[in-house]
Amino acid sequence: MEKLVIGSRGSELALWQANHIKERLKKECSMESEIQIVKTTGDKILDAPLNKIGGKGLFTKELEELLLKGAIDLAVHSLKDVPVVFEKGLDLACITKRADVRDTFLSVKFPDLMSLPKGAKVGTTSLRRSMQIKLKRQDLDTESLRGNVQTRLKKLECGEFDAIILAEAGLCRLNVQGAKYRKAFSVKEMIPSMGQGALGVEMLKNHKHFITLQKLNDEKSAFCCRLEREFIKGLNGGCQIPIGVHASLMGDRVKIQAVLGLPNGKEVITKEKQGDKTRAFDLVQELLEEFLQSGAKEILEKAQLF
């Protein structure tokens, strides 16, 4: 029997994601597969903040190269890591049903962000999170926090940080306990990254099983995530810039919330659009236009200096 080769990063969370797709392939598509671990640029360079490494696709480039060579059949990504413009010949075969989209506060000593003392050190990999933390608490010190989920938790528990911010979806997938205090921010309190909580399966568009993999697609999640990706694409952005965007469906209505600003919490733009689902992509363009008129491009250029 033919076996598909799934390319995956080697972290515990990435392997959970790859195994999740492997199990669904067997159950829903009657297809066997095996996992090949691939080290990406983002995995190799751990002593620098992600925004300082430079370039897009820090966690996807090497996987995409193997897809183009035909060395693997599909690559499983956290959708938030997937660049909005694909290498020629590649595309997403499916976007899975979204898990919890929220960001989560974790601390050993303090119950929430507002209870942290002045000058407390908060660890995060994300300029988007730093920006929204600083928007609420200018007196906090946000610092880069690299490594897998367990490594980050150990740094919290040994006192390197007073608090850290992680994605709730990853914590739930790994069934993470640890940290005395754990509190998820609402989407309004901290707008997530594009695609947060969803997995994206990338393949060659002409792969013979590309259509088959669409059985794993979740229509509602895919629709919302594509709206978010369209917004990021319009700003020529990626996952290492201070932008949050979240689209949600409520019956036939869609709501798109977005935030953009400097990592220090200054010059922040926050806007939202609501309307009929049939006008969803028009609403994205209207929101983009409002952001651009408010100086979004100039703010993003300044953000490159941080």
Indicate where each model-derived feature is located.
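Short, Asp-centered acidic motifs that coordinate Mg2+ and/or phosphate
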Residues: 72-76, 162-163
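Small-molecule-sensing regulatory modules
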Residues: 2-46, 52, 135-306
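Short glycine-rich anion-binding loops that position phosphate/pyrophosphate groups of nucleotides
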Residues: 79-82, 169-171
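Short, structured active-site "lid" loops
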Residues: 48-73
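Extracytoplasmic loops/domains of multi-pass membrane proteins
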Residues: 66-68, 82, 87
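A conserved helix-loop-strand patch within extracytoplasmic ligand-binding domains
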Residues: 79-80, 88-140
